[in-house]
Regions:
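N-terminal, active-site-proximal structural segment of metallo-dependent hydrolase catalytic domains
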Residues: 5-134, 139-160
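Beta-strand-turn-beta hairpins that frame and shape the catalytic cleft
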Residues: 46-56, 65-68, 159, 163-173, ...
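Active-site beta-strand/loop signature of hydrolases that rely on acidic residues for catalysis
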Residues: 55-61, 91-121, 166, 198, ...
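Surface-exposed cleft-lining segments at the edges of enzyme active sites
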Residues: 78-84, 112-114, 179-187, 214-223
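Conserved beta strand-loop-helix elements of the APE1-like EEP
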Residues: 130-133, 158-174, 284, 312-328, ...
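Short proline/glycine-enriched turn/loop segments at secondary-structure junctions
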Residues: 186-187, 307-312, 336-340
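Metal-dependent phosphoesterases centered on the DNase I-like endonuclease/exonuclease/phosphatase
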Residues: 219-325
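Low-complexity, intrinsically disordered Gly/Pro/Thr-rich segments
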Residues: 327-338
Length: 354
């Protein structure tokens, strides 16, 4: 009888541990309110000007963990954190060097940690923008997770992260919009998805509305990503119909080229998250700009199930832009970094307000 009692007690321990963790995760989970006003740090600069060429760079920096030989457990790889603080610093300096070379007027970044186990509690917002004091800066939080005890050998831990918008032109105000997310257990693995809207006054009395976005990838319900995109496009269309200029840039987690496997030579059939971008959702007056050099195609993203191999890694373009018709696009390209500092290459847009 005593053996049975002891055996029952031993079996109950892991069950209670799991139940306790689920309770902890549920208690810690929350979402930020919709239509949250965002602070504009270093507010400065002039109004934007029509018929002036500007450059926008969008860069998913991958919480500064992804050197070219890094693989991530949620992509089927092995690692769950940056290897050490030095790796975060090295990747951060690589990102900064790329930004300085492009010298954009506007800069969007995604997956920028503020305080996270996975990035050794380094404030990446300060690391990446501290030397860029001549930009207006807007931070929008899209991830504040409870401690994730997986993988067991090196848990991913707790994360607070977000998206960052920088602008040389003056930003009068900024707003955070909450996107639809899953409601099941997957909500603990996905982010508190959002986009930010930064309003830049233009000398002709209109506004340039800059949308920084990072849509869902790890979902069990494929309709969530469609709902997110539909909400974003409805908002953009409303601003365009009001006479404003509208540009959205970021990581859409969709194959913007529609057939990246054919273009880059490695099939994506095994990667169900890499679905074609649903262009049928894009309303009149808004268009998709997917950067592609047809003679020398460069992808914007690699699947991080293994170290990057140019010959065998699945690559695609998920980073790009949605632009209103009153914005003239004069150039768009993927900046080739060889995935040295992130699992993404940055994408660049050159444009004029007409």
């Amino acid at each position: 009888m005593k053996k049975r009692i002891w055996l029952g007690a031993l079996l109950a321990i892991p069950v209670l541990a799991v139940l306790g963790y689920v309770g902890y995760a549920e208690a810690a989970y929350y979402r930020l309110e919709d239509r949250l006003a965002l602070d504009v740090d270093h507010q400065q600069g002039d109004q934007a000007q029509p018929d002036t060429e500007y450059t926008l760079l969008s860069y998913n920096v991958g919480f500064l963990a992804y050197s070219a030989d890094y693989s991530f457990f949620m992509d089927g790889g092995e690692e769950s954190r940056a290897r050490d603080p030095r790796a975060v610093e090295t990747n951060g300096q690589g990102v900064l060097e790329t930004v300085r070379e492009v010298s954009p007027d506007y800069l969007f970044m995604q997956e920028v940690d503020v305080d996270a186990t996975r990035s050794w509690h380094i404030d990446e917002v300060e690391l990446l923008t501290g030397e860029l004091a001549d930009y207006n800066r807007i931070f929008a939080q899209n991830y504040d997770s409870p401690y994730l005890f997986w993988p067991l050998t090196e848990p991913h831990g707790a994360s607070r992260s977000g998206i960052v918008t920088l602008s040389r032109c003056r930003v009068e105000s900024a707003l955070r919009r909450s996107l639809p997310v899953e409601t099941g257990f997957s909500k603990f693995l996905d982010l508190d998805r959002c986009y930010s809207v930064s309003r830049v006054p233009v000398s002709n009395g209109r506004e340039l509305c800059l949308y920084n976005v990072h849509l869902s990838a790890y979902t069990t319900d494929g309709s969530i990503a469609t709902e997110q995109l539909a909400m974003l496009l409805e908002d953009m269309e409303e601003e365009y119909r009001s006479g404003n200029y509208v540009i959205c840039g970021g990581d859409f987690n969709k194959d913007l080229l529609g057939n990246s496997g054919s273009i880059f030579g490695v099939s994506g059939e095994a990667y169900t998250w890499a679905q074609p971008f649903p262009e049928e959702l894009v309303p009149e007056g808004i268009s998709l700009t997917a950067p592609l050099d047809e003679e020398h195609p460069i992808p914007s993203c690699r699947n991080a199930d293994k170290a990057y191999d140019p010959e065998t890694s699945f690559v695609l373009t998920v980073d790009g832009f949605l632009v209103s018709d009153n914005v003239e696009v004069t150039g768009a390209q993927v900046v080739d970094t060889g995935f040295a500092w992130s699992d993404h290459n940055p994408v660049k847009l050159v444009f004029r307000l007409t």
